[in-house]
């Protein structure tokens, strides 16, 4: 399982430096949606990381798909994350509440 990161060049830079290979720069809304769909189709990706503000930029239907996705598990960093907390996402993905 791999981690994929989609966002602005500044957002993905730190992930690249940390060794994440699947990083996709998306400066426009169209590129953001295109890269997210590309990651959703990639069976090797287990976690998709997005910036919280980018979640607000994508169409409602795709946002709902991401919020309900188990594989890949979608993590929005920073800002307000609509939907489930990280704890709930991990619980849904792994099947166990790791905080207990």
Curated annotation (Swiss-Prot):
It comes from the Archaea. SUPFAM superfamilies: AtpF-like. It is found in: Cell membrane. Keywords: ATP synthesis, Cell membrane, Hydrogen ion transport, Ion transport, Membrane, Transport. Signal peptide: none annotated. It is a peripheral membrane protein. One of its GO terms (cellular component) is plasma membrane. The keyword Membrane applies. One of its GO terms (biological process) is proton motive force-driven plasma membrane ATP synthesis. The keyword Metal-binding does not apply. GO terms for molecular function: ATP binding; proton-transporting ATP synthase activity, rotational mechanism; proton-transporting ATPase activity, rotational mechanism. Its main location: membrane. HAMAP family: ATP_synth_F_arch. Has multiple subunits with at least A(3), B(3), C, D, E, F, H, I and proteolipid K(x). Component of the A-type ATP synthase that produces ATP from ADP in the presence of a proton gradient across the membrane. Belongs to the V-ATPase F subunit family. This is A-type ATP synthase subunit F. The gene is atpF.
């Amino acid at each position: 399982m791999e981690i994929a990161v989609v966002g602005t060049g500044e957002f993905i830079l730190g992930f690249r430096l940390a060794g994440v290979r699947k990083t996709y720069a998306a400066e426009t809304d169209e590129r953001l949606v295109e890269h997210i769909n590309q990651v959703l189709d990639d069976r090797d990706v287990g976690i998709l990381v997005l910036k919280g503000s980018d979640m607000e930029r994508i169409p409602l239907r795709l946002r709902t798909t991401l919020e309900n996705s188990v594989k890949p598990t979608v993590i929005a960093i920073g800002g307000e994350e609509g939907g489930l907390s990280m704890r709930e996402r991990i619980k849904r993905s792994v099947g166990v509440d790791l905080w207990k």
